[in-house]
Every structure is written in C-alpha cells, then in structure tokens.
C-alpha cells in the first residue's frame, strides 16, 4: 500500500491544469459498448478508475488505443466476445454494475457481472437499478458472487419513475434504453453534468434522447449508430479540490480548464465563507481573500445542489472558519466517518444522527451519523491517518498541508490515484512538500 509524507506550513501558488472528469470518462467508455462503431474520447485522465474501465472493456472485446500523452482514447467494439464480466473486476469500483444495462442492450440472452466496490461511504443499494431494468423487461438475480440478468424477449421501452434521483441508476437505465424497442421515459432522473455529458455523447452517436428540467429523460430505441468524437468535460471535483487547497493555505492558484457553469453551487458556498475566486475564459483563479467566516449550513444534494464529493474537502475549510458550521449529508448515509481523522488532528467537530437542517432527509429515521457541527478556528497538528475513501483522502492531504508539528503520514494514498491524475506532482508544483512512500502492508 502507498503512503505520503506531507509537510505543513506551505502556501500554494501557481497554476495547475484540471483533467477530464473521472465520473464522465468511465461512463462514456461503458457507453461506447452500445455501438459497433469507433468512438474517440479526448481529454481523458490517466487515473486508476479509467485504467480499470479500459481493461474491463478490453476483456469484453473492445479494441482500445490510448495515447496517454495526447489524452486520447480510441475505442471500437465490433463484437461483444464475452457477456460474463471477469471476477477480477469484483469489488474494485462501481463501474461493473453499469454493464448490466450496456451489455443487456447487445446481449439480451444473458449477462453476468461481479459484485461492485467503490468508496465505503454507505450502502449505496442497487434496488433502483434492478427495479428499472425489470420494467424494461429484464430479469435480474443475485447469487452472492455477482448479478445475472437476461431479457428473453429483448428490452422494451417503459415508463420508469425512480424513487430517488440516483446517478448510477439513471446511467444504467439510459444505457439499457438505448437499444430497447420503442420509447423509454425516466422520471425523477438524476441530471448531474456527467449525465448530461453522457446524453451529448449518445446524441452524437445517433440516439434520439432528450431531457427536461423536471428530471425527465426520454429515449427512443436505436439500432444504427454513428462514429463519435467527444471531448470529456473537465473534472469539477478536482477543480474545486485545488481551489479549496489554495484558499486553505492562504495562497493563490489558477486552475486551468475549470468551468464556472459546472461549479456554481460550490463557488457560491466558497464565497459565502470568504473564499476568493476570479473567473476567466480559460479557468478560475482561487485565492485567500480574508479570514474565513463559518456559521453556514452546508447541505449536500443531487444536482443542482452542493455536490457530496465537495463536502469532505470543504469540511477542512470549515475547521479554519470562525464560528460553528453545520454539515448535513443527504446523499450518502455513512460519509462523515472521515471526520474522526480530522478530530485526531485537532479539529473540533461533532457527529449527529439526526438531520441538522431546515428539512429532513431520507436518513432522518435511520441510525446513521449523517450530520455534523464543525467549530472553528482550530489549529491542526500533524498526525498519522489512514484514508478511508477517495474524497476523504484529499481532505486529509489538505489538512496535512496546514498542520503544525512535523510531517503527517497519510496512508492508503493509492485511493487518491483513482480520481486525481498526478496529484503529488501537481501539488508539489504549487509549493507543497509531499513525498510518496511504499509501506509494508503489515504497518497498516
């Protein structure tokens, strides 16, 4: 396992380029399996989840050429050679579950995918996926090792209402509907920018697909596809992460390729606590503007709300903001466990099982620590921490950048490689002092 020695007391200054979005690239690669035509993706980040998805597609029959220097992937899947996804992809991330929709579209006689993995931030149940696929005519079963699905009569368009605007379920049902007979309507769909990027990609491929502001997506089944050349949107999570690190350390960083329209809720909240930013045609400059002011209620939500993946790094900012602030996590029920690591560093925060905001969320009656109060300002001290998940990992790195009393040892940093391209070199180029280490697993 990997680890990093992170020295505190640095001020981040300079320029950094944000990469293509992880959560878009991986889904577009899966979407390419729907077509037997060539697809070209540009602005592709060389990160763990993308590498894994490429290998997954290759295992199914895709021909992939990846020019990593040019950040371009050319993928062509004239035939699906295997409709059973190898167990080697079990429990590593959540991409395999999307293959139920994509592979059923081309192999309705039956597909098998392994159990999913990903960040340990809650149950993230798959019921919405399975119920929607069954409405399209599929039969789905779980045997303890993976999921089997078949559509003996083929997939048939349907009217589907999701109980919650789940991103993964929306993506899966879109993929399954592309080759289904007739029209499919998905109500209460997620409309994250990565889903809109997927819709744009499918339109280029010849699919008749539209979306409305009332969370409705309409898809007409398609059999003939076009070649696609598509530019992946910039990663709004990476852009915000570097922006927060700049403000936290009292620095000034220009994030090239950051796009304002993808980050409106984040930028609003950052400004509300005193963080500075300036938008240009080529990116966004983030800077320390004034002492940070707390007293805010930060409630995560589906788009267009405050993104759950922004929440963890933002909590470090709140630990350095004057006053008490509230976090109410409404997307994932078990995402606040990382705060115990910040407490170890000296952050003054409390976890709560009830909803601490003006409205109750779907976890109000569950026994989940999904709210927190963070009291600032509290100095942070260097510590040894183990990263529990991807975004908590960046939060720990941020905290270590301002920690007093020697370097922090942050373990499990390989999780950061899943979503942040070249993160050590990028931060060090801005003035951070981070050394990667390789530790004996026994040390964990």
From Swiss-Prot:
The active site is at 119 (proton donor). Keywords: Cell cycle, Cell division, Cell shape, Cell wall biogenesis/degradation, Cytoplasm, Peptidoglycan synthesis, Transferase. It catalyses: phosphoenolpyruvate + UDP-N-acetyl-alpha-D-glucosamine = UDP-N-acetyl-3-O-(1-carboxyvinyl)-alpha-D-glucosamine + phosphate. GO terms for molecular function: UDP-N-acetylglucosamine 1-carboxyvinyltransferase activity. One of its GO terms (cellular component) is cytoplasm. Phosphoenolpyruvate binds at residues 22-23. Pathway: Cell wall biogenesis; peptidoglycan biosynthesis. UDP-N-acetyl-alpha-D-glucosamine binds at residues 94, 309, 331. It comes from the Bacteria. CDD domains: UdpNAET. It holds the Pfam family EPSP_synthase. Its EC number is 2.5.1.7. InterPro entries: Enolpyruvate_Tfrase_dom (IPR001986), Enolpyruvate_Tfrase_sf (IPR036968), MurA_subfamily (IPR050068), RNA3'P_cycl/enolpyr_Trfase_a/b (IPR013792), UDP_GlcNAc_COvinyl_MurA (IPR005750). GO terms for biological process: cell division; cell wall organization; peptidoglycan biosynthetic process; regulation of cell shape; UDP-N-acetylgalactosamine biosynthetic process. Disulfide bonds: none annotated. Belongs to the EPSP synthase family. MurA subfamily. Cell wall formation. Adds enolpyruvyl to UDP-N-acetylglucosamine. This is UDP-N-acetylglucosamine 1-carboxyvinyltransferase. The lineage of its organism: Bacteria, Pseudomonadati, Chlamydiota, Chlamydiia, Chlamydiales. The gene is murA.
């Amino acid at each position: 396992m990997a680890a990093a020695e992170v020295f505190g007391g640095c001020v981040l200054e300079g320029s950094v380029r944000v990469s293509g979005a992880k959560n878009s690239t991986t889904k577009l690669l899966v979407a390419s399996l729907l077509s037997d035509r060539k697809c070209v993706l540009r602005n592709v980040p060389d990160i763990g989840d993308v590498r894994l998805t490429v290998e997954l597609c290759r295992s199914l029959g895709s021909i992939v050429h990846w020019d990593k220097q040019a950040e371009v992937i050319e993928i062509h899947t004239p035939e699906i050679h295997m409709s059973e996804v190898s167990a080697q992809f079990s429990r590593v991330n959540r991409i395999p579950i999307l293959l139920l929709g994509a592979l059923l579209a081309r192999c309705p006689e039956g597909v098998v995918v392994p159990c999913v993995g990903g960040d340990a931030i809650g149950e993230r149940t798959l019921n919405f996926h399975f119920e929607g696929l069954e409405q399209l005519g599929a039969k789905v079963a779980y045997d303890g090792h993976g999921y089997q699905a078949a559509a003996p009569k083929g997939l048939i368009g349907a009217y589907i209402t999701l109980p919650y605007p789940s991103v993964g379920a929306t993506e899966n049902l879109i993929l399954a509907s592309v080759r289904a007979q007739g029209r499919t309507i998905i109500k209460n769909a997620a409309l994250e920018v990565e889903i809109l990027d997927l819709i744009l990609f499918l339109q280029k491929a010849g699919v008749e697909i539209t979306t409305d502001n009332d969370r409705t997506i309409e898809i007409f089944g398609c059999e003939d596809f076009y070649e696609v050349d598509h530019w992946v949107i910039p990663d709004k999570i990476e852009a915000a992460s570097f922006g927060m690190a700049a403000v936290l350390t009292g620095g000034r960083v220009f994030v090239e390729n950051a796009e304002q329209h993808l980050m409106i809720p984040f930028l609003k909240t950052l400004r509300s606590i005193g963080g500075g930013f300036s938008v240009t045609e080529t990116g966004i400059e983030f800077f320390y503007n004034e002492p940070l002011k707390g007293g805010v209620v930060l409630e995560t939500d589906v788009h267009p709300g405050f993104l759950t993946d922004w929440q963890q790094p933002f909590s470090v900012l709140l630990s350095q903001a004057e006053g008490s602030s509230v976090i109410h996590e409404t997307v994932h029920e078990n995402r606040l466990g990382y705060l115990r690591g910040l407490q170890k560093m000296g952050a003054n925060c409390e976890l709560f099982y009830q909803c601490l905001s003006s409205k109750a969320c779907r976890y109000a009656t569950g026994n989940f620590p999904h709210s927190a109060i963070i009291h600032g300002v509290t100095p942070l001290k260097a510590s040894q921490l183990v990263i529990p998940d991807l975004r908590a990992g960046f939060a720990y790195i941020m905290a270590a950048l301002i920690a007093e009393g020697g370097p922090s040892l942050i373990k499990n940093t390989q999780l950061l490689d899943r979503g942040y391209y070249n993160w050590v070199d990028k931060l060090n180029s801005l003035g951070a002092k981070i050394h990667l280490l390789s530790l004996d697993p026994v040390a964990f």
